[in-house]
């Protein structure tokens, strides 16, 4: 067991040494735990697609400091700092990408997904390299031991496998939150989900759990469309079959189209109500809810070409516009992707901004409160109503972490999992 008196323990971790470095497996020496820090022996950690660029390509957004790769994971607590109260040695925990302090402005407004202290405080080094450089770990799971703040740790009391649970640390957590928290899906709703990676497929399941009458999944890769149908989608669409898109000239009306878009037209047709009579509940144009989890294929100025296939626009910008246009006049649109370049503009007609009644929510982290929702999601797995096993496609040892990210980038499987102590 690691304790503060045993600080100095040598472990292995996948480190990114600088912004142009490809991460590699390195020995590091742990520092003593302080404050609310928790040491967790890592059993499984999923590869978040948003980290692909930082891991495999030179990245202007990667930290300048030496850092451990990863976005959370699952493991067993082996030591706690002197101020830790929410977990204890021996607990099995999900280490979330973001924490929730419970005290900041966002948390007090029940927006724990936007916690202002989501890292548990200012970054501090948790280990040192063999040549004495400080190592920062955040919520990084690609190490034999994670050192994280207690705010990121959610104790779970279950026999569900660590590989399945690891999907709840980041991507699955976000997708479920998109459909079950940020997006007010009601029984009988029509829901369109863009993207069938681990986030989108989790959103499909979340919409099903909320009672959606029709779920349409939009995905360019064939095997992912097939999996979406198995996990709850009622229909699937290949966006590469509907690529015609031309601007509409002139005033488009409060809820009018600003593009003539073949994909939007197709999805509207699939969501068409049985009647257009507005005095008997008809007249809706488009689905009740649109969830975007498509992402893009551009990182740091590099356009990647996933070997499994790609959509019509590798920058991910077109789909952001389609999400808004497709949404019905009083519907809800939720998006968790960032187009490329990050400062690119998504244009919305001014009259729709003021007079339209569409609702839009940014969906990063899915609106999830980890301590509240994590145990709920675990219970849904236990009862067979939520399938994370189907998303956790392939496991890798810690030494093959970079390859796990490469496979994730190529999208040949839904999600890859690293088992540092497996």
Annotate each predicted stretch with a short phrase:
Residues 317-326, 338-357, 374-376:
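Rossmann-fold NAD(P)-binding glycine/threonine-rich loop
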Residues 200-201:
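N-terminal Rossmann-fold NAD(P) dinucleotide-binding loop
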Residues 29-47, 58-108, 113, 155-160:
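Glycine-rich beta-strand-centered segment in the early N-terminal region that forms part
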Residues 1-9, 252, 277-278, 311, ...:
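C-terminal hydrophobic helical "lid"/dimerization subdomain
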């Amino acid at each position: 067991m690691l304790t503060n008196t045993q600080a100095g323990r040598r472990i292995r971790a996948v480190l990114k040494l600088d912004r142009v470095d490809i991460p590699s497996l390195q020995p590091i020496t742990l520092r003593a735990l302080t404050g609310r820090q928790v040491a967790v022996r890592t059993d499984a950690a999923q590869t978040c697609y948003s980290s692909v660029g930082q891991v495999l390509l030179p990245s202007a957004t990667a930290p300048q400091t030496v850092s451990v790769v990863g976005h959370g994971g699952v493991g067993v607590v082996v030591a706690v700092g002197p101020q830790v109260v929410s977990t204890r040695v021996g607990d099995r925990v999900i280490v979330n990408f973001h924490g929730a302090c419970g005290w900041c402005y966002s948390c007090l407004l029940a927006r724990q997904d936007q916690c202002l202290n989501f890292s548990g405080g200012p970054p501090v080094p948790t280990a040192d390299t063999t040549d004495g450089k400080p190592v920062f770990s955040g919520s990084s799971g690609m190490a034999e031991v994670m050192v994280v703040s207690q705010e990121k740790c959610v104790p779970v009391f279950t026999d569900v496998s660590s590989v399945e649970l690891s999907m709840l640390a980041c991507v699955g957590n976000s997708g479920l939150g998109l459909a079950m928290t940020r997006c007010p899906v009601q029984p009988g709703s029509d829901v369109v989900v863009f993207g069938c990676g681990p986030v989108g497929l989790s959103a499909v399941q979340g919409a099903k759990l909320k009672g959606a009458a029709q779920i349409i999944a939009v995905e360019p890769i064939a095997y992912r469309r097939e999996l979406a149908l198995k996990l709850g989608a009622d229909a699937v669409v290949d966006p590469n079959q509907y690529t015609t898109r031309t601007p509409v000239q002139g005033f488009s009306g409060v809820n009018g189209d600003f593009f003539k878009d073949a994909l939007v037209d197709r999805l509207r047709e699939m969501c068409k109500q049985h009647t257009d009579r507005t005095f008997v509940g008809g007249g809706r144009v488009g689905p009740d809810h649109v969830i975007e989890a498509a992402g893009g294929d551009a990182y740091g100025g590099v356009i990647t070409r996933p070997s499994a296939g790609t959509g019509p626009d590798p920058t991910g910008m077109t789909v952001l516009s389609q999400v808004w246009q497709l949404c019905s006049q009083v519907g809800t649109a939720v998006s968790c992707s960032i187009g490329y370049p990050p400062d690119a503009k998504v244009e919305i007609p001014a009259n729709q901004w003021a007079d339209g009644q569409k609702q839009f929510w940014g969906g990063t982290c899915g609106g999830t409160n980890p301590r509240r929702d994590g145990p709920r999601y675990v219970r849904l797995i236990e009862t067979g109503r939520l399938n994370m096993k189907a998303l956790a496609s392939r496991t890798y040892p810690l030494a093959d972490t970079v390859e796990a990210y490469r496979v994730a980038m190529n999208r040949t499987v839904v999600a890859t999992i690293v088992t540092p102590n497996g």
